[in-house]
Amino acid sequence: MGTHEDTVRTLETELGLVEQGFRGLTAEQWATPTRLRPLDETKPPWTLFELAGHFDISIGLTVMLMAEPQSGQVGRDRASFFIFPRSEVAPVVYDYAYTMVEGKTPEQMPEVLAATFAKTVEGARSMAPDTVGPGYYAPMRLDEFVASRVVEAVVHGLDLTDALGRAPMCTPEGVAVTAAILDDLLARKTVAGRPPDLADDLAWVRAGSGRGPAHPDPRLPLIG
């Protein structure tokens, strides 16, 4: 596990790639559906417009954590953040992306994301790693929350490039952080140990997050 500064640097790089990925999209591309499937299969998948809204929410949670430092017992870490009842959480996350982009245009979203990403990175770099604040489900340390945002950036970055038919843009460092968190998550949710055919970190991230062909291992995917 690297230092907090290493993780912040990795997050900064991943978010920069995501921001650039959204810049310059045509109107048709903004309306491109992602491959994500809502829990309610009667609803449409997010387009890249709603995906951008989700990025603003999920990364912006870091800003909220830093804005409300608190004392008390930490309730989650970088891996356990992703343990939740999908039937309860997924519909809320799905709907909130639509709420986030309401009143905005696709052309505005790159600047919206740039502002949120900059606040996140600047704050994470300037505040103590052991700062505790609201981590959505429970209080979390800043360093643990930042690591969980790398997962968000890498996995949803795959959603962006997959929808556009582009090669993945995530860095080896970002993929390594994400893969390690998924390894930990696998051990906590079921039985530790990746399937032997998923030694490659990017292949593991795709299978563990459901961003690829369905894997026959019944333990997967770990996150949706």
Features from the language model and the residues they span:
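Structured surface interface patches that mediate subunit assembly and partner/cofactor docking
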Residues: 1-17, 24, 31-44, 67-79, ...
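Oxyanion-binding "anion nests"
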Residues: 114-117
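Long amphipathic alpha-helical segments that form oligomerization/scaffold cores
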Residues: 87-111
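Conserved alpha-helical segments that form or flank metal/cofactor-binding pockets of metalloenzymes
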Residues: 49-92
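Short alpha-helical functional segments enriched in proximate histidine and acidic residues
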Residues: 21, 58, 62, 123
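Short alpha-helical hairpin
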Residues: 23-30, 89-93
